[in-house]
Amino acid sequence: MTTIIELPEVLANQIAAGEVIERPASVVKELVENAIDAKSSQITVEIEESGLKMMQITDNGEGMSHEDLPLSLRRHATSKIKSQSDLFRIRTLGFRGEALPSVASISKLTIKTATAEAEHGSILVASGGKIEQLEAVSTPVGTKIKVENLFYNTPARLKYMKSLQAELAHVVDVVNRLSLAHPEIAFTLISDGKQLTQTSGTGDLRQALAGIYGLNTAKKMIDISSADLDFEVGGFVSLPELTRANRNYITILINGRYIKNFLLNRAILDGYGSKLMVGRFPIAVIDIQIDPYLADVNVHPTKQEIRISKERELMALISTAISESLREQDLIPDALENLARSSTRSFSKPEQTSLPLQPSQLYYDPQKNDFFTKETVVSEDSPQGFNHEVLIDSDVKQVDNLQVAKTESEAAAPSVKYASRPDPMLSDGEHPGLDVHNKQKLSQMLDRLENEEQSVFPELDYFGQMHGTYLFAQGRDGLFIIDQHAAQERVKYEYYRDKIGEVDNSLQQLLVPYLFEFSGSDFINLQEKMSLLNEVGIYLEPYGNHTFILREHPIWMKEAEIESGVYEMCDMLLLTNEVSIKTYRAELAIMMSCKRSIKANHSLDDYSARQLLLQLAQCKNPYNCPHGRPVLINFSKADMEKMFRRIQENHTSLRELGKY
């Protein structure tokens, strides 16, 4: 009796699903990629409960015939390759024929499809990989795939799902990446009846960037272009003044496929050279066209990692393209633009409970280097999610020059202004910053800071400053040299540490509320973690699509620090993911004290320097900054006399003692 058996097809598909389908976002990725391969120009993704309850992908592509429909659920059945040679010149996103059978094996699947040549369409219903219904039906040309009760027959997989908001953020990220990879396709994402993302499908990548990352971000992106005999590189990268705290905003595309590649990420950063601050990363969309023979995509279950021939040459091409584009730009920040950015913009006061999430109607005019708007008219006879666009008139509206007539009611309504992100060039370069990913080191730092005891500080008489960095003072024990940045950092750390927890009745109403823009996935993640921000006195309310409004701020935060402070806190929260209130407050106090302290080469007058020393003397631990660096060093009178050889011990020279 043989002990080796061939596994049933359904079981084999479930095993394959373990590699291909990790979460609802994996299903969306595979099915949308199939829609792209079917030459669709419009794709709508609808989900419920972040996709765990239902996902529906509708496209207007080529569709499938009645005969091909049941074959699509067979493993390794595909229309995209037919011979071994095809495997080495793949231009489609899918080719293995594994995704649809894998999805069908762990869910209830319904497919409606029709081709342009067929008299009627077809419907297929399968549960757990077994076909239960296959018959003719009337349906538009294209394909509609509905996935329900994902992982219903593999409950162990459900234990590894994160919260609904986290899973939704993954879905939004997948749709955003595919939208950037294919700006010629109109994408729509709807979650629980709310529209989260919509792109116009005009083929303009900058316009897609504006719809995903916001208008202000898109305006600070510059295009890159370069080519050699093997590669064509295009896309957009952000100016050095526009950065993020992680690499999540870097999108690398090869032949329309989003991939992850450490070396190409490195090439992007090398293109910026020293223009980026340490720990900051650009926003970038790099579109690479390559001969399929030079790329092997058949090395990873999800095809997000590929092998590239001549990878070093491609890295050099990317770095050169970015550095040359940046060289042509005026990288000096425009003071007038910064002033205009902080000016108020009037809006009529909305009803927060009924604020609609409208699709972005921003369109980019490359000749005028600006955006304009279109009015969208939806026909009742059109399929859901597919819009017919009509220009308002022959003259487009310039977004920046759009003026709203002020009626009496609008004049009485409060104004709002868009908050600007902190300039990384103004951040602290003296510290590497918090290593939030090294939990052990962070925990040790927080324990040390928490267990500090009150110290006795000597009386100091300030008398000078050197190089705008070090303060000189004398005391009973000799000469003291103080690092002014570390000193103020310690003072501010103890201030913020004490004040951040006092948020119950310490909120001040803003005369002009601020608006904070985020990408779709970050917006969703922040909504889930909003309670942590509330604990430190930051109350952000959803205000339209991908935007929060701040109406009040904690007393401990100065109004001049609101814009940069809130963005920094949100970035920290997105980086740390899971953090206790206590740890978050401590991290926040360290971060804010470091960012808000005076830097090197900053001259202080006598009064300011003496006040800093008085404040330092009142600190619980005036001898170290929160990172552990010394705040001051001391040369005693004896040390000075030895250095000047006024005294020598046992007639032994200082050089012989090894000191000089």
UniProtKB/Swiss-Prot annotation:
Recorded hits in InterPro entries, A to Z, give: DNA_mismatch_repair_CS (IPR014762), DNA_mismatch_repair_MutL (IPR020667), DNA_mismatch_S5_2-like (IPR013507), HATPase_C_sf (IPR036890), MutL/Mlh/PMS (IPR002099), MutL/Mlh/Pms-like (IPR038973), MutL_C (IPR014790), MutL_C_dimsub (IPR042120)
Work out whether the entry's keyword set contains DNA repair. Answer: yes
- Keywords (A to Z) from UniProt: DNA damage, DNA repair
Q: Which residues form a coiled coil?
A: none
Q: Looking at the keywords, is DNA damage present?
A: yes
Naming one, the record's GO cellular component terms include: mismatch repair complex
Q: Name one GO biological process term.
A: mismatch repair
Q: Which cysteines are joined by disulfide bonds?
A: none
MF (Gene Ontology): ATP binding; ATP hydrolysis activity; ATP-dependent DNA damage sensor activity; mismatched DNA binding
Q: Name one Pfam family in it.
A: HATPase_c_3
For this chain, the family text in UniProt reads: Belongs to the DNA mismatch repair MutL/HexB family.
The record's function comment reads: This protein is involved in the repair of mismatches in DNA. It is required for dam-dependent methyl-directed DNA mismatch repair. May act as a 'molecular matchmaker', a protein that promotes the formation of a stable complex between two or more DNA-binding proteins in an ATP-dependent manner without itself being part of a final effector complex.
Q: What is this protein called?
A: DNA mismatch repair protein MutL
Q: What lineage is this protein's organism placed in?
A: Bacteria, Bacillati, Bacillota, Bacilli, Lactobacillales
